[in-house]
Amino acid sequence: MDRNKTNYLWGGDKPGRTLTLGLQHVFAMFGSTVLVPALTGLNPSVTLLCMGIGTLIFHLVTKGVVPAFMGSSFSFITAICAVMTKYGGNASYVGWGIMASGVLYLILSGAVKLFGVKRITEFFPPVVTGCMIIIIGMMLAPTAMNNVTTVRGDVPQGATVVVTQGDPAADPFVFCEYHYDADHPDSFVSGWLPAENLALKADAEADETNGLAAYTNPGNAYTVLKAGGVSMLSEASESSPTVSGTMRWKYWVVAIFTIIVIVLVMFFVRGFFKLIPILIGIVAGYLLSIALGLVDFTAVREASWFTLPKFSFFAAGPIDWSAVVFAITMIAPISIVTFVEHVGDITANGAVTGHNYLEEPGLHRTLLGCGLATIFSGMMGGPAATTYSENTGVLAATKNYNPATLRFAALFAIILAFVGKVSGVLQSIPAPVMGGVSVILFGMISSVGLRMLVENKVDFTRSYNLIIAGIMLVFGLGLSSGITVGSVTVSGTAIAAVLGIILSKILPKKDADERREEAAQKATAGK
């Protein structure tokens, strides 16, 4: 084999050592990489495949010199969840938003190449990027708590449901209410169900079904042909077929236990295990869930050892262009934040290895690699890709900076994508386990935003920073559902980002009092 090809494959290291260290990088990235699809409803196997191939694309573009792994970006979780919820779990619309994010990376890559790094980052002062990260984390808070407090279950075959959002004749998924108790029709389960599993009930039949006439027109009542679809309990009732009071305290116990385990690992564990507190927390919460009878192994039993990932291609089926616009405006603006994060990640990576990757191979190349990886992932139905700080931590801990170990980690990820049992196990993880993990992760996202403000010494005694932060936070959090103009909905995240950038450019850096005080000081100094 050609010597240069051998060095690219093994990085000049022994094959056995490179493979072992590559496997360690898999453990470092695995928990976070599969957590994003677990929290958003995307397919875990598709995610692993996309991140593996995305990492190889990144290494090809960056000349194979940057020891980085492309993992699932947490910054996009809120936006992905919003799109998935609005359009009944249709991941193909998410793909449009993810691809738009990748295209934005390509544009930023060209801009960096043309104008230089400093000219581009001037549009994103710390007060804007810090507040954007805080907004992202805070918008995720309801998702975290819903995983803890909401008991989920399947609507049984033969049940009558009321379609409250969507058209079963046109949409793949519709939002339904299942009024399971005729004596208490205000207690119901609601959630997204596949339209193909529903059959329209006759008007007379619908009128007499569990008091539905008081809540809907008969034409909205349907019969469930096949059990399935995750449903969310809106109001607790002991008569509910999916919940009991005992079940609810078990959910809280599992969530709190998961949080405690993660905190203990982060503070008191040393060595390799300190790098994977999230994965350890998930395993611990999963084991407790098994003991409490909360785990359904059906997905594990039915999964084959070898399986093809279930792709959600962006152009599959009829396209609702208003949904595409919503997905793009909801997801793509987050690239503004992740662009700054990318610069920080590459800088941190270089600080660990002793190389300035912003200069060689250049920030424009790392952005290009990240953008192409994200576009590929969006096309297949995966999440946005980002350079993982978890793997930078492994580099620092092992002091082995061989980029080839990351390429082998990518190959391991690709192989795992075709192991069906892995996807089955991930699908069987109970909601309270992910809820406990989410409390930690989503809170930390907002904390990172606060840290950015502190590290950059953003002075909140100045009106400039107060106004920008205040307006961004109120619009970003207050318009969490976005603004709808006609058939197009623009996300609150996008609105906050645009307002922050505009205000940072048009507002004077100092108000009248500050300018007067500065002038007085200059006058005094001149005497």
Regions found by a protein language model. Give the residues of each.
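Short, non-helical or kinked segments that cap or interrupt transmembrane helices
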Residues: 42-47, 64-77, 120-129, 274-279, ...
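Boundary regions of SH3-family modules and the immediately adjacent low-complexity/disordered segments
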Residues: 177-233
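Membrane-embedded helical hairpins/re-entrant loop segments and their flanking transmembrane helices
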Residues: 3, 7-16, 38-59, 330-403
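Membrane-interface helix-loop-helix modules in multi-pass membrane proteins
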Residues: 65-100
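Interfacial segments of multi-pass membrane proteins
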Residues: 80-87, 266, 391-406, 412-416
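Membrane-embedded alpha-helical modules
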Residues: 88-162, 218-221, 225-298, 410-518
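N-terminal alpha-helical transmembrane segments of multi-pass membrane transport
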Residues: 1-67, 134, 173, 510-517, ...
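Hydrophobic, membrane-embedded alpha-helices of multi-pass small-molecule transporters
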Residues: 16-32, 246-259, 276-277, 312-345, ...
